[in-house]
Amino acid sequence: MTAITMVVLPLQAQDTTAHRDTVPAVPPAPSIEQLQYMDGLKTVTRGVAQLHDGLSRVSRTQQADSATRHHAAKRLGGLCGTARSFIVSGRPKMKPSAYSDSLRILAKQLTLRLDTLTNALPICERTAGRDPAVATALTTKLKSYDDALLAFKTSQAAFYRPDSAKAQPPTPQ
């Protein structure tokens, strides 16, 4: 025989107070200088994509015959010229003074790495078809730029994201 025991707990008072909806804090709107910086970065990114394409072609053809490798290296030289035109047109808009504090430091690092990359492009244009070391040196500079870009974008995303601790609705008591 089974006995079932029921326990009745007293009803707790229902919370009848109206809770205000909490809206997450709106991140600050970017300034005109910051918009110009991002516009310049967008243009620069087109040039960097050209470099990635050229270096990718060179690395894919390393196991191919010498004529294919030579063709890929010459193509890299041409893409270095195209990339340089995009980078040179976008770089003047990228003024690190558009940002403050740590974001300014990262923006400055990004522009310095971009300038280093830009300085290597004329050599790439002239000698990429003859000297395979050009692709190696360019890959190193491009990796350095990509790391700086990642740090800048990560910091920028964290800066413009609303604080999740402040956006939580109050818990009922």
Regions found by a protein language model. Give the residues of each.
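Bacterial N-terminal signal peptides
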Residues: M1-P10
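Hydrophobic alpha-helical elements and their junctions with loops/disorder across both membrane
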Residues: L9-Q12, G54, I87, L114
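Immediate post-signal-peptide N-terminus of mature secreted/exported proteins
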Residues: Q14-G78, A151-P172
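Long, amphipathic, charge-rich alpha-helical segments that form helical bundles/coiled-coils
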Residues: R75-Y145
